[in-house]
């Protein structure tokens, strides 16, 4: 068929198919005539403006130097815009009346789809057609130029049966999303717009989330494809930002009130409730009961839903909220002499933490069972952590007493020794315990309690699965340590932070090439010369590091050498276009696709 051949070789092809003389007709007329000028004049008379009201205008326009091409182009554009407006109005009518007329229009107009000036009319008809015949979709897919000009509403009908093409469209967006998250985490100039600062509502207004929501529209099949991409990529990379995107995408569709999708996603109400808690930074009794009800009422045969729920809870923003809320409750229990095991909201938070931290293992093993919360975390670890917290409170109170009262006060009892053995023992065995210890470290750093920070930092390298070296935590920790820059002049602070914590994680590239370079960028002038030299040697990038890291390291060296206080802006590393969706399996939804 003529329509299936590339448009660039047949510019204007299609007019003859709707009985309008086009290039082929004119070429034939000029090559077979005896008088070309007469042939052209005849062609103009036959195919020019036929309206009696407009034809008398032509001589006048000629006098004003207006070319016939400009006149006809202007006229065509005006008529085209009116026709498109009429088609869009038709698209709002009742389906029975609309579909029949649009189908007739499509049959008549589609042959001219390769005429660029007329293509918008054809695209408007397609955009308003709910169910497009496959023969048209195949032509659009086959021609790159036509596909590029096709509206998203039409592309959705193409993507539903072409997962690889949809993956090609989605892949750059997923890569962009990961780059944006990592830029916030690693940007050495960023001290204010920290990772956990934006609200959920602001985050899901981001470009990538909104584009994905628009691409999906109301299509359950496309939504499920995206979820399968996210599950597969999370499984392949362990990158928790895919979990964030899963939650943000669902809530973006919630904001848009896409009932076709949110009404059948079994995670919707749970994610909505959790999102409200994160937004308000609080879990009240009502919401805690709702969240617990979702977890308790998963029916037999629907256990696979736990996989998606665990991804929602593995989102760093969810982990941050759950852990921060748990630390707040522990402080409340200390002040009110309560027991951790008696606080049902605390138990629920720990239960959700355990589920979120097991997301990768659950999806990898396909064993959809909620992990059992170790009761000893509640009965032994939390009391030990609370004793550490009481020590810090007593020491803080003691420091506020007048100097003459300190020696006689009971608080002269030492509250600065090593962390309780139970704390160190349980963070080695439990991810939940590790997260709580890490977030208590952030709490003490926020208070600039140097002794409190050092007591916990000394044991954090023992956290299960190297949790303490994950990017969101290190990002937050470094941001809180930078304002404590005066402490870096003391040997005990450097010994604990660098020798006992940082150096234990040097094998992880993100620790050396990202977070430590940012820390040294701001505190290098407070460090003893010998310590700074040792750190710079340990941080020196290798051939395995990208050019951006090498450049940042070199500028840091210059900054140290000159004592510069200004912060030059380092260009972001070049965009990588490697698709993260290579070899992604065909989606297998756990609910009915419509």
From Swiss-Prot:
Highest taxon in the source lineage: Eukaryota
- What organism is the protein native to? Drosophila melanogaster
Q: What Pfam families does this protein's entry cite? A: COBRA1
What's the chief localization of this chain?
nucleus
Recorded GO cellular component terms are:
chromosome; NELF complex; nucleus; transcription repressor complex
Q: Which UniProt keywords apply?
A: Chromosome, Nucleus, Repressor, Transcription, Transcription regulation
> What family does this belong to?
Belongs to the NELF-B family.
| Annotated S-S bridges | none
Q: How is this protein named in the record?
A: Negative elongation factor B
- Which GO terms fall under molecular function for this chain's record? RNA binding
Its function? Answer: Essential component of the NELF complex, a complex that negatively regulates the elongation of transcription by RNA polymerase II.
Q: Which GO terms describe its biological process?
A: negative regulation of transcription by RNA polymerase II; negative regulation of transcription elongation by RNA polymerase II; positive regulation of transcription by RNA polymerase II
Subunit relationships: Component of the NELF complex. Interacts with Clamp.
Cell compartment(s), UniProt: Nucleus; Chromosome
């Amino acid at each position: 068929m003529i329509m299936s051949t590339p448009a660039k070789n047949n510019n204007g092809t299609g007019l003859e198919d709707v009985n309008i003389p086009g290039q082929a007709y004119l070429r034939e007329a000029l090559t077979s005539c005896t008088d070309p000028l007469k042939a052209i004049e005849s062609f103009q008379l036959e195919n020019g403006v036929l309206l009696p009201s407009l034809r008398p205008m032509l001589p006048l326009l000629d006098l004003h130097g207006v070319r016939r091409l400009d006149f006809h182009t202007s006229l065509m554009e005006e008529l085209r815009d009116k026709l498109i407006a009429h088609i869009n109005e038709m698209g709002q009518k009742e389906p029975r009346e609309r579909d029949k007329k649009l189908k007739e229009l499509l049959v008549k107009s589609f042959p001219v789809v390769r005429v660029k000036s007329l293509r918008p009319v054809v695209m408007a008809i397609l955009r308003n057609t709910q169910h497009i015949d496959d023969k048209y979709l195949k032509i659009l897919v086959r021609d790159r130029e036509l596909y590029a000009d096709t509206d998203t509403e039409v592309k959705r009908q193409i993507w539903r049966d072409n997962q690889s093409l949809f993956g090609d469209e989605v892949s750059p967006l997923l890569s962009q999303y990961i780059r944006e998250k990592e830029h916030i985490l690693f940007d050495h100039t960023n001290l204010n717009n920290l990772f956990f600062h934006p609200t959920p509502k602001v985050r899901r207004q981001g470009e990538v989330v909104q584009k994905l929501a628009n691409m999906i529209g109301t299509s359950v099949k496309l939504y499920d494809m995206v979820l399968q991409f996210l599950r597969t990529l999370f499984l392949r990379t362990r990158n928790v930002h895919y979990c964030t995107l899963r939650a943000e995408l669902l809530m973006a569709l919630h904001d848009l009130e896409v009932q076709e999708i949110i009404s059948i996603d079994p995670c919707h109400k749970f994610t909505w409730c959790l999102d409200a808690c994160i937004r308000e930074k609080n879990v009240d009794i009502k919401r805690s009961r709702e969240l617990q009800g979702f977890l308790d009422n998963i029916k037999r045969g629907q256990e696979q839903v736990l996989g998606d729920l665990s991804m929602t809870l593995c989102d760093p923003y969810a982990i941050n909220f759950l852990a921060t809320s748990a630390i707040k409750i522990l402080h409340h229990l200390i002040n009110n002499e309560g027991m951790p095991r008696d606080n049902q909201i605390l138990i629920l938070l720990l239960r959700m933490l355990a589920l979120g931290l097991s997301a990768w293992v659950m999806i990898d093993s396909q064993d959809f069972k909620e992990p059992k919360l170790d009761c000893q975390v509640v009965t032994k670890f939390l009391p030990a952590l609370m004793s550490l917290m009481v020590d810090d409170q007593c020491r803080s109170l003691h420091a506020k007493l007048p100097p003459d009262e300190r020696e006689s006060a009971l608080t002269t009892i030492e509250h600065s020794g090593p962390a309780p053995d139970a704390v160190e023992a349980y963070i080695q065995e439990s991810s939940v315990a590790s997260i709580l210890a890490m977030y208590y470290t952030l709490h003490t750093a926020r208070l600039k309690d140097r002794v409190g920070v050092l007591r916990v930092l000394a044991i954090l390298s023992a956290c299960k699965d190297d949790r303490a070296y994950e990017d969101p935590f290190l990002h937050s920790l470094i941001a809180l340590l930078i304002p404590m820059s005066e402490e870096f002049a003391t040997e005990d602070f450097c010994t604990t932070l660098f020798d006992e914590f940082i150096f234990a994680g040097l094998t992880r590239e993100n620790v050396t090439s990202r977070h430590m370079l940012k820390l040294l960028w701001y505190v290098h002038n407070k460090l003893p010369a010998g310590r700074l030299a040792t750190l710079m040697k340990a941080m020196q990038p290798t051939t395995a590091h990208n050019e951006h890291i090498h450049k940042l390291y070199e500028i840091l060296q210059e900054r140290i050498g000159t004592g510069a206080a200004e912060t030059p802006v380092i260009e972001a590393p070049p965009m990588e276009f490697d698709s993260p969706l290579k070899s992604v399996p065909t989606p297998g939804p756990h609910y009915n696709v419509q």
